């Protein structure tokens, strides 16, 4: 029998712990040591994130998490936009041996809508996206190479 999306999500939610946005806010206000993991996409993160979060997109979680969090007993709270991807990510992290994983119910959207603090600059990124400055530098280098090739072609045509 095939599972539906809801079946998979409900199964994950039965196997993980969840925290409300209010509980997370209280823990952050108390200075509780925890690791915030944002598993949303880059475009979502650019709209804001919870201060202190580290960004590892859900699609790259299994590939990158061991480089980001080596200690599998690190208390970690995972969040996404609405609580679906974070629940699935929490289940995956548990399967990978991480022992203190909690998913934030309601996700970032509920956090923002409650008026809780939202940071704007992008958090540290451990996905596959390249930094803008690197891309701009590469584009400039390619532009110079193209100009050189155009000069060579013009020179050859004049002969």
Give, region by region, the residue ranges found by the protein language model.
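Rhodanese-like catalytic fold shared by cysteine-dependent sulfurtransferases
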Residues: 1-35, 42-75, 84-159
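Short, surface-exposed ligand- or partner-binding patches at beta-edge/loop junctions that are enriched
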Residues: 78-80
